[in-house]
């Protein structure tokens, strides 16, 4: 089941032009794995915190460019 936070994160990714590839690279996992989490097909413990942390790091780097 897809959780509400995943939709929020996808919206934020869209607004900041951050891709699944960006998140996957930051986390050191495959793009398909990130997609499964965001689509509710996987729910590993700590996923929300890890994905939001990676998102914030990427967003900060993009703002400095």
Residue ranges and their predicted role:
Residues 47-64:
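DNA major-groove recognition helix of helix-turn-helix/homeodomain DNA-binding modules
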Residues 15, 33, 47-51:
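Extended, folded domain segments that form the structural surfaces/walls around functional sites
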Residues 9, 20, 48:
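Helix-turn-helix DNA-binding elements, focusing on the entry/boundary residues of the two helices
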Residues 1-15:
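A short, Lys/Arg-rich alpha-helix, primarily the initiator
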Residues 29-43:
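Recognition helix of helix-turn-helix/homeodomain-like DNA-binding domains
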Residues 22-24:
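Short alpha-helical "recognition helix" segments of helix-turn-helix
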């Amino acid at each position: 089941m897809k959780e509400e936070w995943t939709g929020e994160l996808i919206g934020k990714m869209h607004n900041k032009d951050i891709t699944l590839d960006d998140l996957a690279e930051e986390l050191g996992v495959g793009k398909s794995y990130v997609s499964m989490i965001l689509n509710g097909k996987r729910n590993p413990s700590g996923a929300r915190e890890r994905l939001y942390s990676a998102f914030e790091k990427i967003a900060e780097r993009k703002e400095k460019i």
